[in-house]
């Protein structure tokens, strides 16, 4: 294949849909093109497909925006394990992806520390336990901890027929993957221990792979192997976040990743399908279509809801260092960042949600932080709504 033809195919908008490329360029040309990519551009991974052959990816064809990188590298100022506002959205979106009915108010009820009242809230409580587990960087990625994460977030809430056997980390029988156009079987149960050990070893390897790419590869491979009877997608998304936390991306738990997936979950499932369909044409499994999807539809759209502008942080940190902020005000500020993010709130709502401050203290806090330019106030009738971020003049209402 000459260079001009190769370059034309490489820049084709249907690059990751080899079946469409065949119609345009011919089966022979696409086969040759795919082989040239594998030989000269693809990077092998220490993971295998269902045939026992290595997975590949093309690192230069899945670009991550500088803004997306900065968002995930930013350090939340909240003292909470995760952003309550962001993780409310994360859990809500996860249930949307799985077609499970829930409400944000119920999710927030559980995240605020209340006990579950029914089966729906028990599932939410499981997600909360999972988020708390991965937020602790002392909980390293091991097979034992992965099993524990699965059990506390999902496994403990499944019917008996979908539960793992005692002393088993993975399923003991066949499972079918749904979500795409056609169900397909997961990796045979007898091969799961070896495949999952390789996956965990890969997560812990210092191999120079871009961490955001690697997190998405772990996400893909986990769901691809489907090690459980149920809860695989949910655990894959938690695994993704867990890896980012372990790699020093604290804002990962202040970012509702799954919201972006839920907004177009068909594209999420199609990205999986493209990997598998392309393998039938190319003869090898290239995970780049999933990386390309994740970079474009998630990473490059990131908004870390709980992190205010740097100038606001400097104002706060200076005031704190000068002793102008009380301990109660510090706790209230951290709670506002975590619980509301960019959302509006009222003094009455903050009093109810925080549950550990008198209304007079709440009122003094919001007026003071508004005057400092850390909170914006908006009047609507007799009510005043606040949100993180300063006004131009900092004057109280």
Sequence positions of predicted segments:
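FIC/Doc superfamily catalytic core
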Residues: 1-229, 233-397
């Amino acid at each position: 294949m000459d260079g001009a033809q190769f370059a034309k195919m490489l820049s084709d908008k249907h690059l990751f849909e080899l079946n469409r490329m065949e119609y345009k360029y011919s089966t022979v040309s696409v086969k040759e093109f795919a082989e040239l990519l594998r030989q000269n551009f693809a990077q092998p991974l220490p993971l295998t497909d269902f045939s026992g052959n290595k997975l590949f990816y093309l690192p230069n064809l899945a670009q991550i925006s500088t803004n997306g990188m900065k968002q995930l590298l930013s350090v939340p100022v909240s003292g909470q394990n995760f952003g309550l506002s962001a993780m409310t959205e994360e859990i809500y979106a996860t249930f949307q992806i799985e077609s499970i009915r829930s409400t944000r108010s119920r999710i927030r009820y559980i995240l605020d520390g209340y006990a579950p009242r029914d089966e729906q809230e028990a599932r939410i409580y499981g997600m909360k336990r999972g988020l708390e587990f991965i937020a602790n960087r002392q909980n390293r990625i091991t097979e034992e901890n992965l099993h524990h994460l699965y059990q506390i977030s999902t496994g403990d809430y499944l019917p008996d027929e979908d539960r793992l056997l005692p002393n088993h980390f993975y399923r003991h029988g066949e499972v079918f993957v749904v979500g795409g156009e056609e169900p397909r079987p997961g990796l045979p149960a007898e091969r799961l221990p070896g495949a999952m050990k390789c996956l965990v070893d890969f997560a812990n390897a210092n191999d120079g792979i871009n961490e955001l790419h690697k997190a998405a590869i772990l996400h893909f491979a986990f769901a691809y192997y489907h090690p459980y009877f149920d809860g695989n997608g949910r655990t894959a998304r938690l695994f993704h976040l867990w890896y980012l936390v372990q790699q020093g991306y604290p804002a990962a738990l202040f970012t509702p990743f799954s919201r972006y997936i839920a907004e177009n979950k068909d594209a999420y499932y199609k990205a999986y399908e493209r990997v598998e369909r392309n393998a039938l044409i190319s003869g090898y499994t290239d995970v780049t279509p999933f990386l390309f999807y994740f970079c474009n539809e998630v990473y490059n759209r990131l908004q870390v809801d709980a992190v205010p502008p740097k100038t606001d942080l400097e104002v706060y940190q200076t005031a704190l260092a000068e002793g102008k902020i009380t301990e109660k005000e510090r706790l209230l500020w951290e709670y506002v960042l975590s619980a509301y993010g960019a959302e509006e709130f009222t003094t009455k709502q903050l009093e109810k949600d925080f549950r550990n401050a008198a209304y007079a203290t709440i009122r003094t806090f919001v007026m003071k932080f508004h005057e400092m330019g850390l909170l914006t106030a908006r009047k609507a009738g007799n009510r005043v709504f606040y949100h993180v971020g300063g006004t131009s003049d900092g004057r109280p209402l």
